[in-house]
Amino acid sequence: MKTIYPFMGLALCSVTAQAQEKPNFLIIQCDHLTQRVVGAYGQTQGCTLPIDEVASRGVIFSNAYVGCPLSQPSRAALWSGMMPHQTNVRSNSSEPINPRIPENVPTLGSLFSENGYEAVHFGKTHDMGSLRGFKHKEPVAKPFTDPEFPVNNDSFLDVGTCEDAVAYLSNPPKEPFICIADFQNPHNICGFVGANEGVHTDRPISGTLPELPANFDVEDWNNIPKPVQYICCSHRRMTQASHWNEENYSHYIAAFQHYTKMVSKQVDSVLKALYSTPAGRNTIVVIMADHGDGMASHRMVTKHISFYDEMTNVPFIFAGPGIKQQKKPVKQLLTQPTLDLLPTLCDLAGISVPVEKPGISLAPTLKGEKQKKTHPYVVSEWHSEYEYVVTPGR
């Protein structure tokens, strides 16, 4: 069933009336969410209906690539608007291996909070100080059981994140706000791999299993880069899946779709809360991910060094006042959410962007204007997952 958010339509047709009012921003981020499961990008599994509804009223960037296919480096880069080699947050390890973002580095939160915005963050952090400027509320895990799939703290924390974001957006402040609802799922897929290590015969769902992707098989293993050849030795989840049969990979896809549907319901609740008050009319919504997931392509699960599109090509969606609805995804423009989110939101809010930030503002494209400044290429980096293993190759 298609959901219509009542104030969204009003927002899109009331740009002139809102022109002098600073827009609010709601950023919804889902860990591991790849384009390969989002309906707005042509997928037909029906896993992301609330996200698809937002996308249908705004702008969808197809060629959006993250700066690192790993959570902490990607997030530290995203909220600071710099690449991992610039932040020196290059793995998922904590201090002293990875330094915190220095206090003198402008972040998305500091720029907005210093310019009259209330900046709030709910949910997953994993940021090494890059969320400075945001008021963070730690989510309370709410355990529950699932009859078909294993659930862990990722899913439990998302319940608390959803409740916190809904409570805030149902009673928003009078001043302009920038709010982040930062969900863990579909990250619970990592726990699914651990719970199903090796060949297993149980079926997590009844009925027909999802088909394997067209690029499931690795046809020329000896000629692919060494880091990818040895990924089963350097990545725990790939080791756990290394002896799976084809049906086991179909189980994996079914589980990934399940966790995506779980978080989509929570996204729906957050959006309904936003549009339940007049503030929703003046709020730009951004939907994105810190990185993607292998989705059984090239026999890969979760994320790691490979840089395949499944891991690095993420949803990047904007909708709201001042955003000109486009009938088709923007395919001609290369974007780096890691770098481009900060200058784009600052531009839309009328906030000056520090000159040292390497990203570009996508505001012209969002407004239906000519995009003069573009990326000639995109960059994604890899160092190590936890610095325990040196990955071979470049």
Briefly describe each language-model feature range.
Residues 2-9:
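Sec-dependent signal peptide recognition
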Residues 21-26, 57-62, 115-119, 173-181, ...:
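Loop/turn elements at helix/coil->beta-strand transitions in domains of secreted/extracellular proteins
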